[in-house]
Amino acid sequence: MKFAHIADTHIRNLKYHKEYKEVFENLYKKLSIEKVDYIIHCGDIAHTKTQISPEFVELCSDFFKSLADIAPTYIILGNHDGNLRNSSRQDALSPIVKALDHRDLYLLKQSGETHLNDEFTINVLSVFDRENWVKPSVSDR
């Protein structure tokens, strides 16, 4: 079983989009060559959580779709992806994931265990859901 772990992409609203596209294309090629079974992005896809540009939405949408076309992709919110000080505000990624409606794209916003298959479970400790942090099950140690 092969997992690809990605984190801290920090896509900027108006800068470096050409460079992001080049890096992402190389990533897609590498993930395809490696034939990964699951992709997990552990947060901070956005660099600025409260002021999202159309360019960010387009680049992020393409990124998510391309990853999910390669393997089931799980996105965990990072502190840059939502507003920790105002929980009534929506995070930057939910509308994008919802609009894509991709069968292999999952946004994990809450803490807890997520079963990938009969063998593997990931334990999410969300910065947006600290009160529900759990330790892995005894059988998983």
Model feature map: region roles:
Residues 38, 51-61, 65-141:
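His/Asp/Glu-rich metal-coordinating catalytic cores
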Residues 1-63, 69, 141:
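N-terminal active-site segment of His-dependent metallophosphoesterases
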